[in-house]
Amino acid sequence: TSTNSSIGLIYALKKIFKIDKDIYVKIHIITKVKKKILFLGYNNKQTKLIKFLKSKKIIVKTLGQKKIIKKDLTKNIILVVSFGYKHIIKKDILKFSKKLDFINLHMSYLPYNRGAHPNFWSFYENSPKGVSIHLINRKIDKGNLILREKVSFKNLEKQTFKSTYNILFKKLESLFIKNFFKIISKQFKEIKISSKGSFHKKKDLPTTIVNWEMNIKKYLKNN
């Protein structure tokens, strides 16, 4: 579309001339590029990404964690961002909006720990830890990768599942913000996710997990 072409041109100018973020925003205003993003999952109080997008003159439509996405919500949208969304996006929505990018922000270093409770499983199975941003397809957390980053934790003997979750949460927000221009202008290289890795369902969580405030080292020692 002309909107996406304009965004791509602006991104190219930014890259060539090293335009700073303030000038980037002004160029968008001058060219009157209307950008609308549908944000699924966390609300404005739970994540800073919605406020960030609005600061870039993006019109943000939101849909809560437990609400079901419908076809009409994707009209005139340039991007759908899923972060903390509780539902699998049905194939008829993806097919209806096949020219539209759907991306998911996932708290694991894909392809490891697809599905539920990725932070817990990364410790329980001693698999790579990190965050990923990937395109959404019909399979759970198996769309092509856009970005991923490994994360290491300091003072692990003092960490809980909740504290490490919070670290990953902030890292994922930072990864999105840092690469925002690439994402919105589609200036990214897709990487196919390996068939290896791991996948877990909610029901797979051990009953020994009472709450997420449990110390990781102590839990692993006793389980």
Name each region found by the language model.
Residues 1-223:
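One-carbon transfer enzymes
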